[in-house]
């Protein structure tokens, strides 16, 4: 700065000397010299203004560099040190040039002393020139004032730019706060997902407990049924040992058996209804399980979409940062730290999003494992239920076999009763015949007594009477014993019948209790099934809503969002390229203008030298004066050229720095564009993977739905449809029905239709002449088969 001031003072002194020298020159030479002097003064004033402006810019850049040094890294410090070394070298070269200029100035001062002695007569003209010079000074003062006003405007603009930069930094801080808020929201969603996961685990534990309780209840019921079966077996064995019923009680028992058979048929119907309900419940459970899987996949896709949205926000923020960095290139030194911090925050957000994605995948795997465990538990419960039903069926078959055995035993007892009755009738007939014979004997003996006259005959007859009475007494005793035996047998049979009736009552009561237990178990199973259905319905509704939202997002957002991102990235790339081209063109324009100014100044210097060298020499003293004047003008021209070259070099340095900054900014923007392109490629790959996964899941869902629908198909109706298809050959009419019943996929239906059309076309081409076989082929499909 001091050297510039000294050069300015020396320039002013030299200008005054030049004015004094020009007083004694010719009018033409005076006019040319005054014109040249005015031009030089204007050039000097312009160069001074430019020099001051460049100094102010250089000072501002120094301040910015001083502020940015605290934020720059080691590489920037090394670069600044290299630049400082270059500047020191330039300063040394400039100091050497200044020394040379001082030497020339000393020689010029010596020449000026000679000129003062020679040009003492030019005082009048010098006064005129001094008045002109005062006017010029006034003009210079005015220009200085205008320059100060311009500087004030520039300072105001700089303050406004500084305020805008501060506002932009505040906006970036707000955007960072928004990002933090979004990150908190993502964390909250993750916490909600974890809470939902814990609630689902609790529900799974509750369902496990319920399943265990149901299994325990089924085991207890199984034990009760076994104990009841054992009791029934014992009672049946007791009944087998004591069954001799009467006919009326046998009829009542047969009627009760018929009633029991009816009850058993009702129970079979109820069991069939329970089995149908069980199948419906299993289908509903599988459907709900599938919907749960779909809901879990929807949650995973929601998390991925949130991750994609966060990535989009990060990329948009990065683009905004890049644009703002390009707009405030001069303030980038102050904002690089903040941008780096934001980029680090964005990278941390990306890492956290990847972590969230991995956690979501782990949660999905855990959900799938839990669903598989639930499936296995459901299968175990179903197998236990089937085993219980099998055991109930076995018990029913055993009861039926035991009832058949009881009926056989009753029939045998009936046969024994018939034999006993026949024996009683035989004994009664024998007793009556014995009575008749005894009465005939008595009559015969009476006749013999009446006919006998002798005592011996009477005595013999009396003895015979006594023997007959004894025999009658014995027969009556035997009859009494037989009657007592019959009465005791009848009493024992009555007792056995009463015991059997009591046992049958106990058995019927046990059967009723078993029926009540069965009804209670069925009601409990139905209540549990209803509770499960309610829970599954709620889960199905939630997962269905999520699946619908996911499908809507998958159908609407991914392709459009990626295309929009690609278009935005392309537009940003074009915009940045255009800005780079405009900046490069502006820099090239400025460099060309400065080159033109430098070439113009060099041409003017050469012209001045030529004009000064071409001046005539008048006499010795004038020759000395001329020589002295030439030296003075040459020194002045050297000073002007030095000033112009130093200003031009300084401006070139500033332009070079600006160009380097712009190139660095361009490299940063190119790197940013490459990063954005890589992110776009990653997003495209992820979108392709998501679409593939979505297609696979959709196919699996459709296949599972078709399997579930196949399970509820009426096989008799399917059999009739297939028989009608084979009999009539109406493939076009009955193929959709078969496809609906068996849940064919669209590809399978197309294959069947293509095969049918190809077979029909082949038949029409091969069978040109009609034949019975061809006539039958149009009516049924059986004609295509050969039956041996």
From Swiss-Prot:
Q: What domain comment accompanies this record?
A: The C-terminal GRIP domain (711-788) is necessary and sufficient for Golgi targeting.
- Explain what the record says happens when changing residue 717 to A: Reduced interaction with ARF3/ARL1 and loss of Golgi targeting
Composition bias type Basic and acidic residues, residue spans: 16-26
Biased segments, Low complexity type: 763-775
Q: What is the effect of changing residue 719 to A?
A: Reduced interaction with ARF3/ARL1 and loss of Golgi targeting
GO term, biological process aspect, one: Golgi vesicle transport
Kindly give the InterPro entries that the UniProt entry links to this protein.
GRIP_dom
Keyword check for Aminoacyl-tRNA synthetase, yes or no. no
Keywords from UniProt, A to Z, are: Coiled coil, Golgi apparatus
Supply the source organism for this entry. Arabidopsis thaliana (Mouse-ear cress)
Residue intervals of the GRIP domain? 708-755
Q: Where is the composition biased (Polar residues)?
A: 620-643
Protein name listed in UniProt: Protein GRIP
**What subunit structure does UniProt give?**
Interacts with the GTP-bound ARF3/ARL1, but not with the GDP-bound ARF3/ARL1.
**Lineage start:** Eukaryota, Viridiplantae, Streptophyta, Embryophyta, Tracheophyta
Q: Where is the composition biased (Acidic residues)?
A: 1-15
- What is the superkingdom listed in this entry's lineage? Eukaryota
Q: Which SMART domains match?
A: Grip
Which portions of the sequence form the region Disordered?
1-30, 612-643, 763-788
Write out the GO cellular component annotations: trans-Golgi network
Its subcellular locations are: Golgi apparatus
> What's its job?
Golgi matrix protein playing a role in tethering of vesicles to Golgi membranes and in maintaining the overall structure of the Golgi apparatus.
Please list the coiled coil stretches: 30-615
One Pfam family linked to the record = GRIP
């Amino acid at each position: 700065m001091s050297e510039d001031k000294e050069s300015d003072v020396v320039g002013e002194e030299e200008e005054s000397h030049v004015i004094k020298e020009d007083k004694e020159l010719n009018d033409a030479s005076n006019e040319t010299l005054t014109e040249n002097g005015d031009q030089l003064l204007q050039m000097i004033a312009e160069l001074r203004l430019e020099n001051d402006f460049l100094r102010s810019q250089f000072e501002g850049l120094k301040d910015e560099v001083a502020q940015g040094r605290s934020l720059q890294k080691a590489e920037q410090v090394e670069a600044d040190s290299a630049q400082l070394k270059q500047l020191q070298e330039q300063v040394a070269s400039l100091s050497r040039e200044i020394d040379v200029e001082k030497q020339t100035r000393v020689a010029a001062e010596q020449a000026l002393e000679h000129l003062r002695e020679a040009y003492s007569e030019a005082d009048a003209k010098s006064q005129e020139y001094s008045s002109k010079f005062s006017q010029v000074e006034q003009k210079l003062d005015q220009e200085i004032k205008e320059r100060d006003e311009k500087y004030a405007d520039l300072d105001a603009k700089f303050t406004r730019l500084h305020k805008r930069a501060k506002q932009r930094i505040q906006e970036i801080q707000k955007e960072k706060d928004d990002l933090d808020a979004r990150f908190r929201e993502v964390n909250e969603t993750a916490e909600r997902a974890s809470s939902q996961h814990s609630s689902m685990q609790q529900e799974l534990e509750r369902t496990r407990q319920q399943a265990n309780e149901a299994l325990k209840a089924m085991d207890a019921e199984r034990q009760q049924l076994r104990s009841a079966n054992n009791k029934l077996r014992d009672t049946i064995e007791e009944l087998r040992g004591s069954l001799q019923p009467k006919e009326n009680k046998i009829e009542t028992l047969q009627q009760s058996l018929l009633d029991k058979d009816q009850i058993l048929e009702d129970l079979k119907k109820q069991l069939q209804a329970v089995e149908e309900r069980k199948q419906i419940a299993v289908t509903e459970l599988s459907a709900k399980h599938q919907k749960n899987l779909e809901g879990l996949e929807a949650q995973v896709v929601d998390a991925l979409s949130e991750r994609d949205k966060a990535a989009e926000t990060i990329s948009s923020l990065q683009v905004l940062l890049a644009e703002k960095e390009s707009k405030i290139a001069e303030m980038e030194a102050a904002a690089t730290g903040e941008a780096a911090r934001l980029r680090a925050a964005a990278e941390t957000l990306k890492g956290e999003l990847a972590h969230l994605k991995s956690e979501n995948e782990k949660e999905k795997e855990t959900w799938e494992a839990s669903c598989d465990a639930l499936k296995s538990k459901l299968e175990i419960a179903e197998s236990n239920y089937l085993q219980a039903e099998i055991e109930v069926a076995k018990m029913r078959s055993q009861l039926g076999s035991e009832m058949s055995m009881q009926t056989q035993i009753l029939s045998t007892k009936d046969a024994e009763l018939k034999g006993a009755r026949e024996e009683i009738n035989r004994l009664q007939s024998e007793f009556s015949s014995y009575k008749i014979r005894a009465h005939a004997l008595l009559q015969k003996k009476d006749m013999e007594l009446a006919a006998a006259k002798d005592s011996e005959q009477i005595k013999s007859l009396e003895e015979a009477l006594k023997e007959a009475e004894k025999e009658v007494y014995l027969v009556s005793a035997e009859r009494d014993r037989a009657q007592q035996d019959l009465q005791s047998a009848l009493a024992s049979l009555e007792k056995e019948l009463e015991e059997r009736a009591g046992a049958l009552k106990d058995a019927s009561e046990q059967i009723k209790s078993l029926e009540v237990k069965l009804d209670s178990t069925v009601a409990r199973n139905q209540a549990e099934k209803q509770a499960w259905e309610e829970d599954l319905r709620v889960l199905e509704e939630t997962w269905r809503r999520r699946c619908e939202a996911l499908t809507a997002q998958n159908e609407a957002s991914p392709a459009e969002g990626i295309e929009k991102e690609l278009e935005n990235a392309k537009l940003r790339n074009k915009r940045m390229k255009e800005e780079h081209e405009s900046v490069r063109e502006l820099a090239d324009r400025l460099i060309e203008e400065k080159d033109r100014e430098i070439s113009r100044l060099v041409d003017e210097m050469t012209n001045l030298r030529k004009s000064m060298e071409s001046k005539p020499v008048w006499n010795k003293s004038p020759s000395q004066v001329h020589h002295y004047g030439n030296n003075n003008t040459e020194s002045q021209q050297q000073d002007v050229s030095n000033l112009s070259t130093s200003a031009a070099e300084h401006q070139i340095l500033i332009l070079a720095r600006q160009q380097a900054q712009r190139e660095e900014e361009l490299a940063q923007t190119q790197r940013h564009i490459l990063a954005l392109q890589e992110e776009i490629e990653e997003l495209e790959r992820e979108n392709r993977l998501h679409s593939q996964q979505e297609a696979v899941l959709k196919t699996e869902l459709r296949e599972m739905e078709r399997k579930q629908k196949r399970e509820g198909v009426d096989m008799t109706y399917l059999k009739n449809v297939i028989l009608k298809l084979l009999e009539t050959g109406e493939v076009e009419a009955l193929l959709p029905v078969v496809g609906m019943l068996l849940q064919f996929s669209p590809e399978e239906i197309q294959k069947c239709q293509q095969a049918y059309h190809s077979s029909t076309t082949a038949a029409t081409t091969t069978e040109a002449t009609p034949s019975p076989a061809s006539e039958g082929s149009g009516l049924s499909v059986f004609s295509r088969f050969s039956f041996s």
